[in-house]
Amino acid sequence: MPKMKTNKAAAKRFKKTGSGQLKRDRAFGSHLFANKSTKAKRHLRKAALVSKGDQKRIEQMLTYL
């Protein structure tokens, strides 16, 4: 039986917290900042947690995380 492969695209985007939840960056935070308010840009700096519905599928891609 060959080894399972980690999905590298997912591995670059998610980190596992100490409690086992997955942490992710927020969307819409790479460019076009002139159109965003200061408050919106400040919220984009904070990481978010993956929702429970998505967590199981992402963990299947991150076999060894």
UniProtKB/Swiss-Prot annotation:
The terms under GO molecular function for this entry are: structural constituent of ribosome
PANTHER family xref list: 54S RIBOSOMAL PROTEIN BL35M, LARGE RIBOSOMAL SUBUNIT PROTEIN BL35M
Q: Where do the record's region annotations for Disordered lie?
A: 1-27
Species: Brevibacillus brevis (strain 47 / JCM 6285 / NBRC 100599)
Spell out the InterPro entries in the cross-references. Answer: Ribosomal_bL35, Ribosomal_bL35-like, Ribosomal_bL35_CS, Ribosomal_bL35_sf
Q: Which Pfam families match?
A: Ribosomal_L35p
Provide the organism lineage as a comma list.
Answer: Bacteria, Bacillati, Bacillota, Bacilli, Bacillales
Query: Mind naming one GO cellular-component term on file for this protein?
Result: cytosolic large ribosomal subunit
What's the gene? rpmI
- Under which name does UniProt file this protein? Large ribosomal subunit protein bL35
GO BP term (any one): translation
Superkingdom as given in the UniProt entry: Bacteria
Q: Say yes or no: keyword Ribosomal protein present.
A: yes
Annotated family: Belongs to the bacterial ribosomal protein bL35 family.
Keyword field: Ribonucleoprotein, Ribosomal protein
